[in-house]
Amino acid sequence: MNNQGMKNPDMKATILLPGTASGDVLKLEAPLSFWGGVDPKTGTIIQVRHPQCGTRISGRILCLPATIGSSSSSAVLLELIRGGNAPAALVMGAPDAILLIGCLVAKEMGWEAPPAVALSAENQRQLADGHYTLAADGAMIPTAS
């Protein structure tokens, strides 16, 4: 696959937590609260009114155009990381300090946490569906799965 996965192949995200990841992109159609919205045991969206309820976020490059805050979201993300059900990477429309805390605590505990980047909701929509690699410099590179 080539750079046609994005309308703008030079698009780069702002690095919030460094790292690399690869996986299928999951572009959320609506904001999500991790607290009460994601099952920490399965990595499945359980927020009943969410359009993607029932979809697993585990191992995916999760594009969050916006989040619905709860201070407990960091604990849910930490449980997802501990249980091996976390997203491969977090792509946030705007930095969410609460989710980032979950990743930072996981790293402090010696667990591998997903990298996190900021990419506007508009730019997230430009990502084609498919498999991507999030490069260390924040580039979203379409790749074969």
Show which residues each predicted segment covers.
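Feature captures the catalytic cores and cofactor-binding loops of soluble hydro-lyases/lyases
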Residues: 14-17, 26-136
